[in-house]
Design a protein with these regions (language model features):
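Non-catalytic structural scaffold of enzyme domains
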Residues: 1-269
Length: 269
């Protein structure tokens, strides 16, 4: 079981931000198995029942690949599908909302925290609840930014379209006087430069990827499942449900190297 891989599941390319953090924080002997459901991205515009169904289909596919833990590298799934996943999958299942909320509570100065995410994530109130657990007196302001996902998927992360979209979405949050902004979708760190420039240097941006990676490492250590091998990254495997060449292009640019093992598959079969 120690030598089994770690599943990383997202609706598309955004989960590569979590993949990159896992590769940095975990021992080199760990093997990662990534699934991006690019045929059905974005998840944030779907109903909760649909998101849960998609989440279970993807998790079952990864479980068949012999994983030892599952990382839900998608805020929408983390917001609405974690209970169903933990009931269905007899493995450690880690989402991104809890670690991200805790990180935001550590860095906020005035306890006025903004959260941007998909419509489903913001509607769920999951971040507000998680932040209130750690910092009950905090004021949390949510803003859905659905167009950031297709911009990230297309690689339009630092151009005039991205900048205009950021200004349109984030102006109200700036006026609310937030001092911390949670990037509540794993696609959004791909637009971090534009978001940061829009918000200004006085607003701390919180990316849940590293915090999630540290939680995953701790969970594996607790269970004696952390690999001590010297190699593993060369065996990383990427699966997508559509547009594999587009994923290869954007993913290779973000990760700084080729995606050697990339397959297009059907998880509904």
């Amino acid at each position: 079981m120690v030598d089994a891989g770690i599943g990383v599941f997202d609706s598309g390319i955004g989960g590569l931000t979590v993949f990159k953090a896992l590769r940095h924080e975990l021992p080199p002997g760990e093997r990662l198995v990534y699934l991006g459901d690019t045929a059905r991205v974005p998840y944030g515009t779907k109903s909760e029942d649909t998101v849960v169904r998609y989440a279970l289909e993807g998790a079952q596919f990864l479980q068949k690949r012999g994983i030892k833990a599952l990382v839900i590298a998608c805020n929408t799934m983390s917001a609405v599908a974690l209970p169903a996943l933990r009931q269905a999958i007899p493995l450690p299942v880690v989402g991104v909302i809890g670690p991200g909320a805790e990180a935001a509570c550590r860095v906020t100065r005035r306890q006025v925290i903004g959260v941007i995410g998909t419509a489903a994530t913001i509607r769920s109130g999951a971040y507000a609840s998680a932040i209130a657990h750690h910092l009950p007196e905090a004021r949390v302001i949510g803003r859905a930014c659905p167009l950031f996902v297709p911009l990230a998927e297309e690689g339009w992360v630092d151009n005039e379209v991205a900048r205009a979209t950021a200004e349109a979405y984030l102006g109200d949050l700036k006026r609310e006087g937030i001092d911390t902004l949670v990037l509540g979708c794993t696609h959004y760190p791909l637009l971090q430069r534009v978001i940061g420039a829009t918000m200004g240097q006085d607003v701390a941006l919180v990316d849940s990827a590293r915090a999630t990676a540290l939680v995953v490492r701790a969970r594996l250590e607790e269970r004696g499942l952390l690999s001590g091998g010297a190699t593993g990254g060369d065996d990383d495997h990427f699966f997508v449900t559509d547009s594999s060449e587009r994923f290869r292009e954007v993913g290779s640019r973000f990760l700084g190297g080729p995606l050697a093992r990339l397959e297009q598959i059907d998880i509904t079969a």
